[in-house]
């Protein structure tokens, strides 16, 4: 795909150049044998997106917004809306594209607001976001001054959603690759690595933490957000078949247990900068998804519990240095 060739050209002349030893072969294999059955339809939808005045105002500092509501006539606006809805479900956002409000399931801006004041200045930094979804936070990282932003997520619909937004922003230092963390070599090249909402999906959280550490420069910063439970340093919840209707949830540590894991893996200066119970105004059903959302995952008679009887989702943000 053309976008990957552009990425190769970019990293050939920067500190990520050694990634070229493995990445092209991985993405070539992905493109030849692992494409989703709907991928060609998504690509046609992407190709049909309108080309709007390149001088449109772009704001990725305070939100992710391109242009204004008067940029398109009624017919153009409706066509844009119909095309973007072909990429449903939209999980993470929101986005504002020429007056179109993509009201995603998650208000990912809430999470950004919780962490932004605690992280190191991103100005001039190389940043990696692992499990980045459709890339909402990639744009906010760029808006915060990052020099080069890379997101990885193996879900192909997220790649197409990212490409749809990038069609209107076209900010070349922001990239999304359809990879899982296990496919990354030890790059040791990023100043800041974000891993938000991923750890509890990993069968081996300790291996995952080592994988994160292997992407950071010496002294680089890890920003990790994950589900937690109350308890001491020995408290870890291992749910049964499902947690909040999710099948792939493996480990929910306490704050102290998570800190101990990070320290055991060689991170230092470990601290918790925020804890927050996920609220119904942060994750909810909208017209941009066709599935259930948080309200459906909680006990209808006791919102402090999941429908399975576990503690309701509570998240913490940890920051540490490699």
Swiss-Prot record:
Pfam families: Methyltransf_9
Keywords linked to the UniProt accession: Transferase, tRNA processing
UniProt superkingdom: Bacteria
InterPro entries: CmoB, Mo5U34_MeTrfas-like, SAM-dependent_MTases_sf
Keyword flag Transferase: yes
Record-listed E.C. numbers: 2.5.1.-
Binding-site residues, carboxy-S-adenosyl-L-methionine: 92, 106, 111, 131, 153-155, 181-182, 196, 200, 315
Gene Ontology molecular function: methyltransferase activity; transferase activity, transferring alkyl or aryl (other than methyl) groups
SUPFAM superfamilies: S-adenosyl-L-methionine-dependent methyltransferases
Keyword Transcription: no
Subunit structure: Homotetramer.
Protein name: tRNA U34 carboxymethyltransferase
């Amino acid at each position: 795909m053309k976008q990957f060739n552009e990425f190769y050209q970019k990293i050939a002349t920067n500190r990520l150049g050694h990634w070229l030893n493995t990445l092209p072969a991985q993405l070539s294999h992905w493109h030849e044998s692992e494409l989703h059955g709907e991928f060609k339809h998504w690509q046609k939808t992407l190709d049909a997106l309108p080309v709007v005045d390149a001088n449109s105002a772009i704001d990725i500092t305070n939100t992710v917004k391109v242009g204004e509501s008067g940029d398109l006539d009624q017919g153009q606006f409706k066509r844009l809306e119909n095309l973007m809805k072909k990429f449903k479900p939209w999980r993470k956002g929101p986005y504002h594209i020429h007056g179109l409000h993509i009201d995603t399931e998650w208000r990912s801006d809430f999470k950004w607001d919780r962490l932004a004041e605690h992280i190191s200045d991103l100005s001039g930094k190389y940043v990696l976001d692992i499990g980045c979804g459709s890339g909402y936070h990639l744009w906010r990282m760029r808006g915060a001054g990052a020099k080069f932003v890379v997101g990885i997520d193996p879900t192909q619909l997220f790649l197409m959603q990212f490409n749809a937004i990038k069609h209107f922003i076209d900010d070349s230092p922001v990239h999304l690759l359809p990879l899982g963390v296990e496919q990354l070599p030890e790059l040791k090249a990023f100043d800041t690595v974000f891993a938000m909402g991923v750890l509890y999906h990993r069968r081996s959280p300790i291996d995952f933490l080592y994988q994160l550490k292997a992407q950071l420069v010496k002294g680089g910063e890890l920003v990790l957000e994950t589900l937690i439970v109350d308890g001491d340093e020995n408290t870890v919840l291992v749910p049964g078949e499902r947690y909040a209707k999710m099948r792939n949830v493996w480990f929910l540590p306490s704050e102290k247990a998570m800190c101990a894991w990070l320290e055991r893996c060689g991170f230092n200066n470990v601290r918790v900068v925020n804890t927050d119970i996920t609220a119904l105004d942060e994750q909810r059903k909208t017209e941009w998804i066709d599935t259930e959302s948080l309200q459906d995952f909680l006990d209808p008679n006791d919102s402090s519990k999941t429908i399975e009887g576990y503690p309701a989702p509570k998240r913490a943000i940890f920051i540490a240095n490699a």
